[in-house]
């Protein structure tokens, strides 16, 4: 079936593997008024005859990154979009995505869509890419705080993250 937009990262399915190594699709409620986009994960699941699980979390894929080993991150927009408590959001992430460590950070860009993919990306279970701006940039301090945050936490292997910066003036 058709969709309403081309933002597949925002509304597409998230694949999970359970303890029996069985693959399924987890579907969040898409945070935009685009019903055909919101239905895309169900359509993919039906087409591929893949198990489907729906979570009550409202979000967009652009505000979610995961290392594939139980560590994920989003901006605090995920709390603002949901009527459930922050603890309930974390529990849904654990129950449906296997996320035992969920980092939720203030959006350092503080503009537009507040998606984490506007300034950060897990490149692997050990590497994270963070936006870098000149010291004269309005959000310089906030972006550096995010980089410092990741420099002071550990990855799934219990090691410091390897931080890569991309200059985006």
Show which residues each predicted segment covers.
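The feature marks the mature, well-folded catalytic cores of soluble enzymes
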Residues: 1-169
